């Protein structure tokens, strides 16, 4: 990467809007990527720099570019909960169902680490609520792991399979049982979670309960 492109890339990464504009006017390539395949759009989207994202898109940034792990700008923005940036990227043509090398989508990232409004936005734009990553995990499983009841409700209302299993036969209810919060377990059961399902080792959800939580949870899971 030459000096102009390096200065442009660094400016985008730190949120220096004026410097970004200056470097583009001097010939910087808006789609230049670093050694990991990350572009200025990816960096600024993940860090929440709305004005830079808008400028880059207006000046030809590739909204579908992928880094060496096949991650996109939308995935980064969704993970960090940047709703307005997610909107800009989707409007510019970002694929809400693209997945990285591990099969993970923007919705999965938002369900685990992002914000309810981003989850709702992605669902509204057609994100597949039952997509699975390479380990068989779904967005609902991720939201369960993060104890995010609002996200879980949004996913279930959109048709997420409450009894989906990962590659080990583990369900969202089994994850909730291990985490140990009665409200989480009760919520899933009320939405159709089957406590009689077994994983591929023959374990029921109740077998995932840790010893210190068993007394509080056994009544819900028996």
Protein language model features and the residues they cover:
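Conserved ankyrin/ankyrin-like repeat signature
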Residues: 19, 51-52, 84-85, 117-118, ...
């Amino acid at each position: 990467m030459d000096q102009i492109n390096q200065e442009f890339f660094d400016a985008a990464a730190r949120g220096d809007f004026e410097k970004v504009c200056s470097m583009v006017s001097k010939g910087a390539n808006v789609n230049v990527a670093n050694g990991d395949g990350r572009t200025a759009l990816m960096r600024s989207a993940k860090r929440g720099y709305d004005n830079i994202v808008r400028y880059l898109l207006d000046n030809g940034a590739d909204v579908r570019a992928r880094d060496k792990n096949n991650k996109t700008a939308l995935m980064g923005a969704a993970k960090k909960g940047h709703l307005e940036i997610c909107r800009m990227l989707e409007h510019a043509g970002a694929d809400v169902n693209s997945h990285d090398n591990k099969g993970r989508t923007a919705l999965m990232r938002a369900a685990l680490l992002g914000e309810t409004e981003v989850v709702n936005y992605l669902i509204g734009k057609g994100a597949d609520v039952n997509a699975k990553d390479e380990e068989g995990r779904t967005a609902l499983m991720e939201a369960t792991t993060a104890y995010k009841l609002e996200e879980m409700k949004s996913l279930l209302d959109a048709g997420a399979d409450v009894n989906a299993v990962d590659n080990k036969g583990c369900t969202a209810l089994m994850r909730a049982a291990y985490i140990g919060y009665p409200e989480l377990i009760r919520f899933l059961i009320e939405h159709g979670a089957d406590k009689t399902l077994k994983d591929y080792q023959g374990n029921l959800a109740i077998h995932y309960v840790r010893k210190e939580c068993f007394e509080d949870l056994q009544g819900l899971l028996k």
